[in-house]
A protein has these predicted regions:
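Short structured motifs
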Residues: 55-60, 117-124, 137-138
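Acidic/polar, low-complexity intrinsically disordered N-terminal segments immediately downstream
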Residues: 3-7, 30-113, 131, 143-154, ...
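Hydrophobic helical h-region of N-terminal Sec-dependent signal peptides
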Residues: 17-22
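C-terminal motif of bacterial Sec signal peptides marking the signal peptidase cleavage site
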Residues: 24-28
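Short, hydrophobic beta-strand segments
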Residues: 122-129, 134-144
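Solvent-exposed serine/threonine-rich low-complexity stretches and specific carbohydrate-binding patches
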Residues: 105-110, 118-126
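Bacterial N-terminal signal peptides that target proteins for export
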Residues: 2-16
Length: 178
């Protein structure tokens, strides 16, 4: 019996000591070091999250038959949510589309305004929240399905109550699929 207790104690120490070593050596990763960045003093700004994920480029979407909706989100970016509302005005930006075509050798065509409707372009992100959106409804039956035409619906943040980030141009590539 005494031999079993010694054996169990030996096994416990052979497992416990390496575990303690790992625990204390890994915990050093949690300490602040010279490469720690303090974001607590960064100010708030607004952006289009989908534009940020796609570097202000074309985001292709294929819609089926019928009427389809698409939210264009505006994000209030900050270390913590604000205690006041943030306003933003979103607009259709033909100048950005033209500049994009010229700079990239593309020939995207502005989606005719008769092919979609949108909720208000004047957005308010309530205090304590991060997002608001323009809901775009595409009338798929009106969109020309000619494969030689590439339609784009270009959005931009025209103005906002907080600074506007560089991710403020969203170009939705609209195609009609099966």
């Amino acid at each position: 019996m005494e031999k079993n207790i010694k054996s169990i104690t030996k096994v416990r120490w052979t497992v416990l000591l390496p575990m303690l070593f790992i625990l204390f050596s890994v915990s050093s990763c949690l300490k602040n070091g010279p490469y720690n960045i303090d974001f607590s003093n960064v100010g708030a700004s607004v952006d289009l999250p989908l534009a940020a994920a796609n570097a202000n480029g074309v985001v292709p979407f294929t819609f089926g038959t019928g009427s389809n909706t698409f939210p264009v989100y505006v994000n209030m970016a900050s270390p913590a949510v604000l205690s006041k509302a943030t306003t933003a005005v979103v607009a259709i930006d033909t100048a950005y589309l033209n500049a994009y075509n010229a700079n990239n050798g593309t020939s995207y065509t502005l989606l005719p305004d008769s092919d979609y409707t949108a909720t208000s372009f004047n957005l308010t992100i309530p205090a304590g929240q991060r997002l608001d959106s323009v809901i775009v409804t595409f009338n798929i039956s009106k969109i020309d399905t000619d494969p030689s035409v590439s339609y784009i619906l270009p959005f931009t943040i025209a103005s906002a109550s907080e600074p506007i980030e560089q991710w403020n141009h969203l170009m939705i590539g609209v195609t009609v699929g099966p």
